[in-house]
Amino acid sequence: MIIDFKKYSSVRIGNEFEVLVLDQICDFDGFLIGGANNLLVSPKPKNIGILGDGFNFIQILDRNKDFIHLRIGCKTKSSKMYRFAKENNLKGFEYLSKIPGTLGGLLKMNAGLKGECISQNLIKIATSQGEILRANINFDYRFCPLNTHFFWAEFKLNFGFDTLKDEALKNARSNQPSGASFGSIFKNPKNDFAGRLIEAVGLKGFSKGDAMLSDKHANFLINKKNASFEDAFFLIELARKKVFEEFGTNLENEVIII
């Protein structure tokens, strides 16, 4: 299938490329995309694949009075997982109301919010290399060590959807800028914030072409209208360079560049 990444990706940057649809668990020599919410696509990306619709599902494997055991396809959107948890009175997915993307992408970056993350209720992941138990995966902050493709995952959730947490999360990320963006450019370094460092070196609101380091939150890159890959990449590398020169801190990408 052909995907126009200027329309498909959240930052609205990219060209049209042929994307291979994977309808079953298999090896694939390339990059597997999800919702393209934290993705910047270059003019010459490597092979791109996407999961077929057969991996968009939530299946109940077991349930009792205390918990429910789910298998979820990695093309399933976070919003669908959140709604399922809320409708079935399940605890542990409340934060997904504020994190866009598909399950595969969430697992790849161990996505989370307010001290919670997608790996916390995980049992195992089905990959192109076989099924891998959570106990054998060394997740860390915004990090998953597995360099393979994900197809479905299983979770164990307790009952008791947290309505207070859900309400509190409604104001989470209210400081984030609007507009076409891939979210945070960099991971926060330990005991600091990437946005603070970028602002401290004078780059908050700095533009190159139609790409801008947001004047509301410096760790966000905004496509004002028709930003190019080159403009966006220039700003990312400029911010990294300036912060390292000033503070000796090497900012690590949260955005994935292919």
Swiss-Prot record:
GO BP annotation list: cell division; cell wall organization; peptidoglycan biosynthetic process; regulation of cell shape
Gene name, Swiss-Prot/TrEMBL: murB
One Pfam entry name: MurB_C
Protein's name according to its UniProt entry: UDP-N-acetylenolpyruvoylglucosamine reductase
Keyword Cell wall biogenesis/degradation: yes
Catalytic residues identified in the record: R142, S184, E254
One GO MF term attached to the UniProt entry: UDP-N-acetylmuramate dehydrogenase activity
NCBIfam families, alphabetized: murB, PRK13904.1
Record's subcellular location: Cytoplasm
Cellular component per GO, a single term: cytosol
Record-linked SUPFAM superfamilies: FAD-binding/transporter-associated domain-like (SSF56176), Uridine diphospho-N-Acetylenolpyruvylglucosamine reductase, MurB, C-terminal domain (SSF56194)
InterPro entries xref list: FAD-bd_PCMH-like_sf, FAD-bd_PCMH_sub2, MurB, MurB_C, MurB_C_sf
Family in the record: Belongs to the MurB family.
Catalysed transformations (reactions): UDP-N-acetyl-alpha-D-muramate + NADP(+) = UDP-N-acetyl-3-O-(1-carboxyvinyl)-alpha-D-glucosamine + NADPH + H(+)
Species lineage: Bacteria, Pseudomonadati, Campylobacterota, Epsilonproteobacteria, Campylobacterales
Cofactor(s), by name: FAD
Primary residence: cytoplasm
Pathway: Cell wall biogenesis; peptidoglycan biosynthesis
Enzyme Commission number(s) from the entry: 1.3.1.98
Keywords annotated in UniProt: Cell cycle, Cell division, Cell shape, Cell wall biogenesis/degradation, Cytoplasm, FAD, Flavoprotein, NADP, Oxidoreductase, Peptidoglycan synthesis
Function according to Swiss-Prot or TrEMBL: Cell wall formation.
